[in-house]
């Protein structure tokens, strides 16, 4: 999101206004990435980005109150169903609401 430094992903990351590193049951503690939410429209633990093996990554909405959108690099926009993983591709943008956009870049 605007003003945030890039974060190198090596394991699970939880995105939210006050994320819980242990929200993913049965998985090791995750890195947390706090995002601004002045209107509290972004859930505390809103979404997770997780490795899926062989360099691929997945996005999961963690049952957030207002949902998560995935804006694909090809122009498609999709609602991410709660607790369902969807593939992330280079250039995709995770839309958490309140104009908080997280760009996924593969290097």
Located regions from the model:
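Short polybasic amphipathic segments
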Residues: 1, 66-70
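Intrinsically disordered, low-complexity acidic Ser/Thr-rich regulatory segments
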Residues: 1-40, 89, 100-107
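C-terminal boundary/linker segments immediately following FHA domains
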Residues: 15, 54-56, 63, 71-107
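Membrane-targeting and insertion segments and their boundary/processing signals
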Residues: 21, 61-62, 68
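Buried hydrophobic-core signal for structured, non-transmembrane domains
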Residues: 47-49
């Amino acid at each position: 999101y605007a003003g945030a430094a890039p974060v190198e992903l090596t394991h699970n990351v939880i995105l939210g206004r006050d994320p819980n590193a242990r929200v993913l049951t049965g998985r090791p503690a995750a890195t947390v990435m706090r995002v601004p939410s002045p209107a509290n429209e972004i859930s505390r633990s809103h979404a997770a980005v997780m490795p899926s093996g062989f360099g691929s990554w997945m996005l999961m909405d963690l049952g957030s109150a207002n949902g998560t959108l995935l804006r694909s690099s090809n122009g498609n926009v999709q609602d991410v169903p709660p607790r369902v993983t969807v593939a992330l591709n280079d250039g995709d943008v995770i839309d958490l609401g309140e104009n908080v956009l997280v760009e996924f870049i593969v290097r």
